[in-house]
Design a protein with these regions (language model features):
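Short linear motifs at protein or domain termini
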Residues: 1-109
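Alpha-helix N-cap/N′ positions at the starts of helices
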Residues: 7-8, 98, 113, 135, ...
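Generic hydrophobic alpha-helical segments
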Residues: 12, 140-141, 204-205, 209
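A short secondary-structure junction motif
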Residues: 19, 78, 82, 140, ...
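Non-transmembrane, amphipathic alpha-helical segments
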Residues: 98, 102-105, 125, 146, ...
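Conserved amphipathic alpha-helical segments that form helical-bundle/coiled-coil interaction surfaces
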Residues: 109-110, 116-186, 202, 219-223
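C-terminal all-alpha effector/ligand-binding and dimerization domain
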Residues: 178-247
Length: 247
């Protein structure tokens, strides 16, 4: 099914779902018109009959149509796709506005600060804090397997390390750098596009901190941030190759 047909089906299903009573083709046509679709009532009638045949809707006498349980399930599926598409477009806009140079500058600053935070965390982390980080990695692994976002897991992982480092100045500096709320989702989007994986990096950082080896922890964090920088470069070469290199 084309994206245009999916969007139209989504709008029709949503219109029927939002109504507390069965709806007819005239009502659906007006709702579609308000959403920018100029479709005749006859065409809407044909679409509704096709939806009956697919099992998404059923007629209630002469009153109109309602959604079947299958139709409700289909609407949920399309709503999920709609949100992902909308969110993806938002992230693309954020990436364009932020720009390659700014993203890399942010990551370079993070490399300097977070490498030291990882080093200090390896020295001062408590058993309870180690357990918390381990739990974050466990949930991140589950989210990766299910194809869900790990942006929140990423923020939590790095914040726990910063807190375990017992250096309030570096912790505050990291908060300042990461105050852009879309930074983690943006980097996650870029990593997916270039087929990069962050979980392995996080596991290596955790192992170094858990073994209380400051040098290994610092190096693991440096490698992690450098991998992110490389992902940004790959993404820009792939998507904006013909644009200004400093975009």
């Amino acid at each position: 099914m084309s994206s245009e047909k999916k969007q139209l089906l989504y709008q029709v299903l949503k219109t029927i779902s939002n109504s507390s009573v069965p709806v007819g083709s005239g009502f659906v046509r007006e709702s579609l018109r308000l959403n920018g679709y100029d479709i005749s009532e006859a065409t809407v009638g044909r679409i509704l009959r096709e939806m009956d045949a697919e099992g998404y809707t059923e007629k209630v006498g002469f009153k109109g149509r309602i959604l079947t349980s299958y139709g409700i399930e289909k609407l949920r599926e399309l709503e999920h796709d709609h949100k992902i598409h909308h969110y993806g477009n938002e992230l693309i806009n954020v990436i364009k506005v932020t720009g390659r140079k700014n993203l890399i500058d942010i990551l370079i600053a993070r490399k300097v600060i977070e490498s030291q935070l990882a080093r200090f965390a390896a020295q001062y982390i408590t058993r309870r804090e180690l357990k918390e980080i381990e739990e974050v990695i466990k949930f991140q692994r589950i989210h990766v397997e299910k194809g869900l976002s790990i942006a929140e897991d990423d923020v939590r992982f790095h914040k726990l390390i910063a807190q375990a480092a017992r250096n309030r100045v570096l912790d505050a500096a990291l908060d300042l750098i990461r105050q852009h709320g879309q930074l983690s989702p943006v980097l996650e989007y870029i990593r997916k596009k270039v087929k990069s994986k962050v979980l392995l990096d996080h596991e290596k950082i955790f192992e170094a901190i858990a073994s209380r080896n400051p040098e290994e922890a610092e190096n693991a964090m440096v490698n992690h941030i450098e991998n992110l920088i490389e992902d940004v470069e790959k993404y820009w070469n792939m998507v904006y190759e013909s644009d200004d290199v400093n975009m």
